[in-house]
């Protein structure tokens, strides 16, 4: 249903992915489905990306580059996992707001 909704509103897609193991497969499948439906994918956002203090995970470290390369996506945005991000309160930590503000959303939407 998301594909039908995306086609209806006519805006480029921004795919949001998780950072962990398996995300390359899930994201590439999503990109394939979107493109097969004739939709333009403008960016992939990897949400809750671990910060510097998080334990090192080689799969997480490799995911952004592999998604960009194998998914043929020019823009892969990392939004770090911050304690002040709260979905229920609809709040973002200043670091996350800064990252999101750097993306040219109007340009992506073709406005």
Where do the PLM segments sit?
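Class I SAM-dependent methyltransferase SAM-binding "motif I" and its flanking Rossmann-like core
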Residues: 23
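C-terminal lobe/tail of nucleotide-utilizing enzymes
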Residues: 32-111
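Short low-complexity stretches enriched in small and charged residues
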Residues: 1-3, 31-34
């Amino acid at each position: 249903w998301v594909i039908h909704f995306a086609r209806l509103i006519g805006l480029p897609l921004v795919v949001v992915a998780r950072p962990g193991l398996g995300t390359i497969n899930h994201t590439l499948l999503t990109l394939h489905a979107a493109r097969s439906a004739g939709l333009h994918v403008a960016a992939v956002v990897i949400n809750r990306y671990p910060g510097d203090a998080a334990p090192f995970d080689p799969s997480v470290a490799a995911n952004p580059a592999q998604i960009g390369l194998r998914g043929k996506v020019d823009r892969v945005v990392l939004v770090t996992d911050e304690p002040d991000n709260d979905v229920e309160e609809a709040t973002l930590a200043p670091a996350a707001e800064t990252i999101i503000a750097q993306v040219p959303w109007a340009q992506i939407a073709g406005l």
